[in-house]
């Protein structure tokens, strides 16, 4: 495997260059804006391309060292691409709603994850059948709520080593928590956003479905490349694996790697979106 390649044409076709209406711009993004067209800011893809490449490199290196990546995208059009991409590369995601303290109060979040696993086990072994109807319905409601909020991080086993964010305005709390703990942030930053707090900026449209799908696919493939490197370092002969089984081997290796990796300690639609 190798770091994923992408072309300027792919960025154009996905609408990565379309920003927001000119009156909604954030001056902090001025250096990344090429110009405007019909009242819409146009991002400079000659800057986006190398900055996206750098972000992919960081993702690959993080995973190759056994690090965890947390995909964060809770807006409607990002929810499915974020979940699919994270699952494809055996990483983790938050795509429902960012819960305050997810990173800075990890101990409490871990307790909630344990609760979710406990309910899942009781559901699987039939233990819920011995409860009253009211108790059973209460547990089922808790299960649905916890799965939606924490299902994507239930196997993370500790704090992530890097987070990848779609829409820094919407996910400002996640970024603030990551910065407080010194966790690097890779993020897509649109023309109406501030890049403050983002370590690896990807100037680009954060609303168009095709653009979001492209970012998520590239980040996922970079993570897979990193995990491939990790397996090779561990002595796994990837060339001997059957075609199509590399990703399965990577996915099987991920839980063990997550358990072994030391957990950081907390200190604490295809067109420019006018009114996202």
Swiss-Prot record:
GO terms classed as biological process: translation
Entry keyword annotation includes Cell wall biogenesis/degradation: no
A GO cellular component annotation in the UniProt record: cytosolic small ribosomal subunit
Region (Disordered): 251-276
Gene3D superfamilies, per the entry: Glucose-6-phosphate isomerase like protein, domain 1, Helix hairpin bin
InterPro entries: Ribosomal_uS2 (IPR001865), Ribosomal_uS2_bac/mit/plastid (IPR005706), Ribosomal_uS2_CS (IPR018130), Ribosomal_uS2_flav_dom_sf (IPR023591)
Highest taxon listed in the record's lineage: Bacteria
Annotated NCBIfam families: rpsB_bact (TIGR01011)
UniProt xrefs under PANTHER family: 30S RIBOSOMAL PROTEIN S2 PROKARYOTIC AND ORGANELLAR, SMALL RIBOSOMAL SUBUNIT PROTEIN US2M
Stated family: Belongs to the universal ribosomal protein uS2 family.
Protein name in the entry: Small ribosomal subunit protein uS2
Organism (species): Jannaschia sp. (strain CCS1)
Gene name in the database record: rpsB
């Amino acid at each position: 495997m190798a770091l994923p390649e992408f072309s300027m044409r792919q960025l154009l076709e996905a609408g990565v260059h379309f920003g927001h209406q000119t009156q909604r711009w954030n001056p902090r993004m001025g250096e990344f804006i090429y110009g405007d067209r019909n009242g819409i800011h146009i991002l400079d893809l000659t800057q986006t391309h190398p900055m996206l490449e750098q972000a992919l490199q960081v993702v690959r290196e993080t995973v190759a060292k056994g690090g965890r990546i947390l995909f964060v995208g809770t807006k409607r059009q990002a929810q499915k691409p974020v979940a699919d991409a994270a699952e494809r590369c055996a990483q983790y995601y938050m795509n429902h709603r960012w819960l305050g303290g997810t990173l800075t109060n990890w101990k409490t979040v871990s307790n909630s994850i344990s609760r979710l696993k406990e309910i899942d086990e009781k559901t699987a072994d039939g233990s819920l059948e011995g409860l009253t109807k009211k108790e059973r319905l209460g547990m089922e409601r808790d299960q649905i709520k916890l799965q939606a909020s924490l299902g994507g991080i239930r196997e993370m086993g500790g704090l992530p080593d890097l987070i990848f964010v779609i829409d820094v305005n919407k996910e400002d709390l996640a970024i603030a928590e990551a910065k407080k703990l010194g966790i690097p942030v890779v993020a897509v930053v649109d023309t109406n956003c501030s890049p403050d707090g983002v370590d690896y900026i990807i100037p680009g449209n954060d609303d168009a479905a095709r653009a979001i799908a492209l970012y998520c696919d590239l980040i996922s493939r970079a993570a897979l490349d990193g995990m491939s490197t990790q397996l090779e370092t561990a002595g796994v002969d990837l060339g001997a694996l059957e075609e199509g089984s590399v990703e399965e081997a990577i996915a099987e290796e991920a839980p063990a790697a997550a358990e072994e990796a030391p957990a950081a300690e907390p200190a604490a639609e295809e067109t420019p979106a006018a009114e996202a």
